[in-house]
UniProtKB/Swiss-Prot annotation:
Keyword Nuclease belongs to the record: yes
Annotated family: Belongs to the endoribonuclease YbeY family.
Function comment: Single strand-specific metallo-endoribonuclease involved in late-stage 70S ribosome quality control and in maturation of the 3' terminus of the 16S rRNA.
Source organism (scientific name): Neorickettsia sennetsu (strain ATCC VR-367 / Miyayama)
Annotated Zn(2+) binding sites: 109, 113, 119
Protein name, as recorded: Endoribonuclease YbeY
Amino acid sequence: MLEIRITDPRWTKKLKNLDALLQKALECCLEGKKAEFSVVLTDDEFIRTLNKSYRGRDTPTNVLSFNYTNEQIGIGIIGEVILSFDRLVIEALENEIKFEDHLLHMFIHGVLHVLGYDHSSDRETLAMEKKEEEILKKLALLG
């Protein structure tokens, strides 16, 4: 299950099928396992505040993810992914890719962090990128 909180109305103006899109991506990430996630669709200002508080970086970022235990947030919810509309629009334009594609990639990236993937070393980075590509290909086939 995916709980979606939207703090910036530009998200719903940009994408009409947001709920279904993210739910399908989460299902592909979980590979049949049951888990609850929360996603916050926000802006640069909010994500910058979180990035400063939790990572010591006073700058906006595209995605943040938080891994929770049951005691921290509630039974069943294992993680939260936070995405910045502003960052994703800028990065999609810079990389000449569709906003929807970049959103899916960054959402998957955040979910994989919650599931234990990381990119602290070259080996971890390769494993995470490979998993992201597998999920994106699967989504394209389901699309």
